[in-house]
């Protein structure tokens, strides 16, 4: 019995067998966290691009009274896909609905505007683009994460009418 207790052969294999599950959890958890932050970065970049696109549209595309834009569908497409084409693939997997992107317009009438905004009686229009997309988990099929996790972002741009 003493020889069996003092025998150290196989100790490293036993330690490895105990550590592998923990190492796998850490490794795949790191993959999932990295993918989440990458997806979050993509939606932040998408709303910035959508707001930037909206800011370059002419002043006539915006109605300050109703807070809407006649070009809302194009702005939503640019935000969701990166281009105005409706057949382009989405930037985030499963982000297929333009209803997930909202476009709103506010006009600053409290300030006296000059420059390119001088002729606008309703003030300088500011476009806000907001978006929400469901997070496409790397390991969602395994049932490890809730399927209702969303990523969201918003961005604003002053309409330059260029």
Predicted regions: what they are:
Residues 32-38:
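Transmembrane signal-anchor/signal-peptide helices with a preference for the extracytoplasmic
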Residues 5, 19, 130:
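Conserved beta-strand segments that form the floor/walls of ligand-binding pockets within enzyme
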Residues 12-32:
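Alpha-helical hydrophobic helix detector
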Residues 8, 34, 57:
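Residue-level signal for short amphipathic helical patches enriched in basic/charged
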Residues 40, 45-162:
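Short, conserved structural patches
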Residues 1-11:
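N-terminal leader/signal peptides at the extreme start of proteins
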């Amino acid at each position: 019995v003493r020889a069996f207790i003092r025998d150290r052969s196989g100790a490293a294999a036993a330690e490895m067998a105990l550590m592998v599950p923990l190492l796998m959890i850490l490794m795949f958890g790191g993959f999932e966290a990295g993918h989440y932050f990458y997806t979050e970065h993509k939606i932040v970049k998408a709303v910035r691009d959508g707001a930037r696109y909206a800011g370059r549209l002419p002043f006539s595309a915006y109605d300050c009274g109703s807070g809407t834009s006649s070009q809302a569908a194009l702005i939503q497409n640019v935000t969701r896909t990166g281009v105005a084409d409706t057949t382009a693939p989405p930037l985030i997997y499963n982000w297929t609905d333009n209803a997930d992107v909202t476009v709103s317009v506010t006009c600053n009438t409290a300030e006296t505007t000059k420059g390119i905004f001088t002729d606008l009686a309703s003030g300088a229009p500011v476009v806000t683009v907001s978006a929400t997309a469901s997070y496409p988990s790397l390991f969602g099929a395994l049932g490890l994460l809730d399927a209702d996790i969303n990523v969201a972002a918003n961005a604003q741009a002053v309409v330059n009418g260029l």
